């Protein structure tokens, strides 16, 4: 069989206890969820659900095309304008998911010849972005700006450091001020995934980047 190896790999994963099973939630399930990313409880907020329903009635159930062709609506541009203003950026770009945003950011900012220094605790989407980018990825010890400096030292070409602001698995935070200082010292860019900081940290929930000790030129997804 051409794909017989799939069954073999599946059996190995089963024996190792790595098989995961989906557990669908029923409508009306009591909203006690200790594993959710919905920190602020906005997913069920009446204004959010009504806004989503109103948008569906106005624009339909899908974009009907890619953003570059026919898929961009006034809602997209309005949201991007408001997000940029809220976060203090010149502009914002909304993608379909955080995973897509990280792949887009890393691959766009790490062309051929770029040294990519990725934190060992980064989310899988950042790791995949590093793998897909045309630069050369090097993993640095978790939350260790000195390790980032060491990885950047001696590289003459373009370089970028990639890190979560708040790491989703352990819940600890990157040392942003020192990380930004290391990047400035070596002329490297800094890409931050603030998915778990935006709305929770910073002035008015504007994200980890807005903390007084961590201001730095960044790209946040």
Report each predicted region and the residues it spans:
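N-terminal "arm"/small-domain region of PLP-dependent enzymes with the aminotransferase-like
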Residues: 2-61, 188, 220
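Conserved N-terminal alpha-helix of the aminotransferase class I/II PLP-enzyme fold
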Residues: 50, 58-97
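Substrate-binding/gating loop at the entrance of the active-site cleft, primarily
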Residues: 96-99, 117-133
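Conserved PLP-anchoring active-site segment centered on the Schiff-base-forming lysine
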Residues: 105-124, 145
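Short, structured coil segments at secondary-structure junctions
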Residues: 112, 132-134, 186, 216-217
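Active-site phosphate-binding strand-loop segment of PLP-dependent enzymes
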Residues: 138, 142-192
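Conserved active-site segment immediately N-terminal to the catalytic lysine
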Residues: 187, 196-198, 205-221
């Amino acid at each position: 069989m051409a794909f017989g190896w799939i069954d073999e790999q599946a059996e190995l994963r089963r024996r190792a206890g790595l098989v995961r099973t989906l557990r669908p939630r029923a409508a009306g399930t009591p909203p006690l969820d200790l594993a959710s990313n919905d920190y602020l409880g906005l997913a069920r907020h009446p204004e959010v659900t009504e806004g989503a329903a109103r948008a569906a009635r106005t624009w339909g159930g899908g974009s009907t095309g890619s953003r570059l062709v026919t898929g961009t609506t006034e809602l997209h541009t309005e949201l991007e304008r408001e997000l940029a203003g809220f976060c203090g950026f010149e502009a914002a770009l909304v993608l379909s998911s955080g995973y897509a945003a990280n792949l887009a950011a890393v691959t766009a900012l790490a062309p051929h010849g770029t040294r990519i220094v990725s934190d060992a605790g980064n989310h899988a989407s950042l790791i995949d972005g590093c793998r897909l980018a045309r630069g050369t990825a090097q993993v640095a010890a978790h939350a260790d700006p000195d390790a980032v400096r060491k990885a950047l030292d001696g590289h003459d070409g373009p370089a970028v450091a990639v890190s979560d602001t708040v790491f989703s698995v352990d819940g600890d935070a990157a040392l942003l001020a020192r990380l930004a200082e290391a990047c400035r010292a070596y002329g490297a860019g800094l890409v931050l995934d603030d998915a778990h900081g935006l709305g929770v940290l910073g002035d008015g929930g504007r994200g980890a980047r807005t903390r007084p000790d961590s201001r730095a030129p960044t790209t946040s997804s």
